[in-house]
Amino acid sequence: RFTPNQTSVNDRQTSQNHGSNPVRSTQCCDPELSGTVLELLNTYPPVGFVPLFVDVPASPAGTHAAPDPFLTQTETILRTGAPITDLIGLGIGLTPSGDDFLCGVLAGLTLLGLRDSQDFRHLSAEISRNLAKTNAISAAFLRCAMDGQFSEALVTLGSVSFVQSLQMFHDIGHSSGADTLCGLYFALCGLYFAFG
Protein backbone atom coordinates (compact mmCIF):
# COMPACT_ATOMS: atom_id res chain seq x y z
CA ARG A 1 0.00 0.00 0.00
CA PHE A 2 1.13 3.58 -0.46
CA THR A 3 2.16 4.97 2.91
CA PRO A 4 4.03 8.14 3.83
CA ASN A 5 6.76 8.24 6.42
CA GLN A 6 10.10 9.91 6.98
CA THR A 7 12.17 7.55 4.83
CA SER A 8 13.14 7.95 1.22
CA VAL A 9 11.09 6.89 -1.77
CA ASN A 10 13.47 4.02 -2.44
CA ASP A 11 12.86 2.34 0.92
CA ARG A 12 10.53 -0.63 0.55
CA GLN A 13 8.89 -3.10 2.88
CA THR A 14 6.92 -6.30 2.29
CA SER A 15 3.17 -5.86 1.96
CA GLN A 16 0.25 -8.24 2.30
CA ASN A 17 -1.76 -6.47 -0.44
CA HIS A 18 -1.47 -8.32 -3.75
CA GLY A 19 2.07 -9.40 -2.80
CA SER A 20 3.45 -5.95 -3.56
CA ASN A 21 5.81 -3.60 -1.79
CA PRO A 22 4.37 -0.47 -0.23
CA VAL A 23 5.96 2.70 -1.48
CA ARG A 24 7.46 4.99 1.12
CA SER A 25 7.65 8.73 0.55
CA THR A 26 9.00 11.74 2.29
CA GLN A 27 7.15 13.18 5.26
CA CYS A 28 3.62 14.45 4.61
CA CYS A 29 3.36 18.03 3.42
CA ASP A 30 0.35 18.56 5.71
CA PRO A 31 0.46 15.92 8.45
CA GLU A 32 -2.70 17.07 10.24
CA LEU A 33 -4.95 17.12 7.19
CA SER A 34 -3.42 13.96 5.73
CA GLY A 35 -4.07 12.25 9.08
CA THR A 36 -7.73 13.25 8.87
CA VAL A 37 -7.90 11.96 5.29
CA LEU A 38 -6.35 8.65 6.36
CA GLU A 39 -8.89 8.36 9.21
CA LEU A 40 -11.69 8.93 6.70
CA LEU A 41 -10.23 6.31 4.33
CA ASN A 42 -10.12 3.80 7.18
CA THR A 43 -13.93 4.01 7.46
CA TYR A 44 -14.40 2.56 3.95
CA PRO A 45 -14.70 -1.07 2.95
CA PRO A 46 -12.22 -2.18 0.25
CA VAL A 47 -13.85 -0.18 -2.59
CA GLY A 48 -12.15 1.67 -5.42
CA PHE A 49 -8.52 2.51 -4.72
CA VAL A 50 -8.85 2.22 -0.92
CA PRO A 51 -6.85 -1.07 -0.70
CA LEU A 52 -3.84 0.74 -2.17
CA PHE A 53 -3.76 3.21 0.71
CA VAL A 54 -5.08 1.50 3.85
CA ASP A 55 -4.96 -2.02 5.25
CA VAL A 56 -8.15 -3.87 4.45
CA PRO A 57 -9.36 -7.09 6.09
CA ALA A 58 -7.99 -10.25 4.55
CA SER A 59 -10.32 -12.64 2.72
CA PRO A 60 -11.95 -15.23 4.99
CA ALA A 61 -9.90 -18.40 5.47
CA GLY A 62 -10.19 -20.76 2.55
CA THR A 63 -11.29 -18.09 0.07
CA HIS A 64 -9.08 -16.39 -2.42
CA ALA A 65 -10.41 -13.24 -4.02
CA ALA A 66 -8.81 -12.52 -7.36
CA PRO A 67 -6.90 -9.22 -7.42
CA ASP A 68 -8.98 -6.41 -8.89
CA PRO A 69 -7.59 -5.68 -12.39
CA PHE A 70 -8.22 -1.95 -11.94
CA LEU A 71 -6.24 -1.95 -8.69
CA THR A 72 -3.42 -3.87 -10.29
CA GLN A 73 -3.32 -1.48 -13.24
CA THR A 74 -3.51 1.56 -10.96
CA GLU A 75 -0.73 0.30 -8.74
CA THR A 76 1.43 -0.31 -11.81
CA ILE A 77 0.78 3.21 -13.10
CA LEU A 78 1.56 4.80 -9.73
CA ARG A 79 4.69 2.74 -9.07
CA THR A 80 6.38 2.74 -12.46
CA GLY A 81 6.43 6.43 -13.23
CA ALA A 82 3.88 6.04 -16.02
CA PRO A 83 1.98 9.28 -16.61
CA ILE A 84 -0.59 9.70 -13.84
CA THR A 85 -3.02 10.73 -16.57
CA ASP A 86 -3.10 7.06 -17.60
CA LEU A 87 -5.68 6.83 -14.80
CA ILE A 88 -8.21 8.88 -16.80
CA GLY A 89 -11.26 6.74 -17.51
CA LEU A 90 -9.87 3.83 -15.47
CA GLY A 91 -12.48 2.00 -13.47
CA ILE A 92 -16.22 1.62 -13.48
CA GLY A 93 -19.08 3.90 -12.59
CA LEU A 94 -20.45 7.25 -13.67
CA THR A 95 -17.17 8.85 -12.65
CA PRO A 96 -14.43 6.21 -12.95
CA SER A 97 -12.12 5.70 -9.97
CA GLY A 98 -9.12 7.07 -11.84
CA ASP A 99 -10.94 10.33 -12.56
CA ASP A 100 -12.08 10.70 -8.95
CA PHE A 101 -8.50 10.05 -7.84
CA LEU A 102 -7.21 12.79 -10.16
CA CYS A 103 -9.82 15.23 -8.81
CA GLY A 104 -8.42 14.46 -5.36
CA VAL A 105 -4.84 15.03 -6.54
CA LEU A 106 -5.85 18.40 -8.02
CA ALA A 107 -7.59 19.30 -4.75
CA GLY A 108 -4.50 18.33 -2.77
CA LEU A 109 -2.20 20.41 -4.94
CA THR A 110 -4.64 23.31 -4.57
CA LEU A 111 -4.71 22.92 -0.76
CA LEU A 112 -0.92 22.96 -0.76
CA GLY A 113 -0.98 26.31 -2.59
CA LEU A 114 0.43 24.86 -5.81
CA ARG A 115 -2.26 25.92 -8.32
CA ASP A 116 0.18 28.35 -9.94
CA SER A 117 3.04 25.85 -9.99
CA GLN A 118 4.51 24.29 -13.10
CA ASP A 119 3.49 20.85 -11.74
CA PHE A 120 -0.18 21.86 -11.51
CA ARG A 121 -0.17 23.49 -14.95
CA HIS A 122 1.52 20.45 -16.50
CA LEU A 123 -0.90 18.01 -14.87
CA SER A 124 -3.89 20.12 -15.94
CA ALA A 125 -2.61 20.30 -19.52
CA GLU A 126 -2.12 16.52 -19.63
CA ILE A 127 -5.57 15.89 -18.18
CA SER A 128 -7.11 18.27 -20.74
CA ARG A 129 -5.35 16.43 -23.59
CA ASN A 130 -6.73 13.09 -22.37
CA LEU A 131 -10.34 13.95 -21.49
CA ALA A 132 -11.60 11.94 -24.47
CA LYS A 133 -10.62 8.78 -22.52
CA THR A 134 -13.54 9.27 -20.12
CA ASN A 135 -17.24 10.08 -20.27
CA ALA A 136 -18.70 13.59 -20.54
CA ILE A 137 -19.85 13.79 -16.91
CA SER A 138 -16.50 12.76 -15.51
CA ALA A 139 -14.69 15.08 -17.94
CA ALA A 140 -16.82 17.95 -16.62
CA PHE A 141 -15.80 17.09 -13.03
CA LEU A 142 -12.14 17.05 -14.06
CA ARG A 143 -12.50 20.43 -15.79
CA CYS A 144 -14.08 21.86 -12.63
CA ALA A 145 -11.21 20.48 -10.52
CA MET A 146 -8.64 22.03 -12.87
CA ASP A 147 -10.49 25.35 -12.39
CA GLY A 148 -10.38 24.99 -8.60
CA GLN A 149 -14.02 24.01 -8.17
CA PHE A 150 -14.48 21.07 -5.83
CA SER A 151 -17.27 19.24 -4.03
CA GLU A 152 -18.59 20.56 -0.73
CA ALA A 153 -16.96 17.58 0.99
CA LEU A 154 -13.51 18.70 -0.21
CA VAL A 155 -14.08 22.41 0.33
CA THR A 156 -15.23 21.95 3.94
CA LEU A 157 -12.70 19.25 4.91
CA GLY A 158 -10.98 20.39 8.08
CA SER A 159 -13.56 23.08 8.85
CA VAL A 160 -16.47 20.79 9.76
CA SER A 161 -16.56 17.93 12.24
CA PHE A 162 -15.07 14.57 11.36
CA VAL A 163 -18.56 13.05 11.43
CA GLN A 164 -19.86 15.66 8.97
CA SER A 165 -16.91 15.07 6.63
CA LEU A 166 -17.41 11.34 6.93
CA GLN A 167 -21.06 11.63 5.93
CA MET A 168 -20.34 13.98 3.02
CA PHE A 169 -17.64 11.75 1.52
CA HIS A 170 -19.70 8.58 2.00
CA ASP A 171 -22.60 10.31 0.23
CA ILE A 172 -20.50 10.75 -2.93
CA GLY A 173 -21.27 7.67 -5.03
CA HIS A 174 -20.32 4.05 -4.40
CA SER A 175 -16.55 4.66 -4.34
CA SER A 176 -16.16 8.23 -5.64
CA GLY A 177 -15.72 9.78 -2.19
CA ALA A 178 -13.12 7.17 -1.26
CA ASP A 179 -11.24 7.50 -4.55
CA THR A 180 -11.20 11.30 -4.24
CA LEU A 181 -9.78 10.95 -0.72
CA CYS A 182 -7.10 8.57 -2.06
CA GLY A 183 -6.02 11.19 -4.60
CA LEU A 184 -6.06 13.91 -1.94
CA TYR A 185 -3.92 11.75 0.36
CA PHE A 186 -1.55 11.00 -2.53
CA ALA A 187 -1.00 14.73 -3.09
CA LEU A 188 -0.91 15.84 0.56
CA CYS A 189 1.73 13.25 1.42
CA GLY A 190 4.04 14.30 -1.37
CA LEU A 191 3.58 11.01 -3.22
CA TYR A 192 2.52 12.95 -6.33
CA PHE A 193 5.99 14.48 -6.57
CA ALA A 194 7.64 11.09 -6.16
CA PHE A 195 5.44 9.14 -8.58
CA GLY A 196 3.17 11.57 -10.49
Locations of the language-model features?
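Phosphate/adenylate-binding glycine loop and adjacent helical scaffold
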Residues: 1-12, 19-21, 25-89, 93-98, ...
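Internal, well-folded beta-alpha domain core
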Residues: 101-102, 113
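Long, charge-rich alpha-helical interaction segments
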Residues: 126-128
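Intrinsically disordered, low-complexity linker/propeptide segments enriched in Ser/Thr/Gly/Pro
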Residues: 189-195
